């Protein structure tokens, strides 16, 4: 599975209020327990004061991510980018360093 950074921002206060209600309903109906096996949340941060949040997830595809996020798409701007954690970054840098030594 690939790791992704999901960044999101509500477009206005009304959308944030509606999104908050949706989140409460999703959470109270077992939302986190109903995620597919091929979708894992590593971290979730939301700054309610400015309507901006970030999540780091692992998923088998972008399609899996969009299935989780589609209810909120009309309320917020969402961007998804591949990312790595510290161990993965160090491993990649070491690999690149080794490859340049043999050139």
Locations of regions flagged by a protein language model:
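Conserved catalytic core of Hanks-type protein kinase domains
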Residues: 58-59, 71
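Short amphipathic alpha-helices in soluble, non-transmembrane regions
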Residues: 65-74
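Short S/T/G/P-rich N-terminal loop/turn motif that feeds into the first structured element of a domain
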Residues: 1-52, 60-64, 90-103
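Conserved short beta-strand edge segments in small beta-sheet-based binding/regulatory domains
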Residues: 75-87
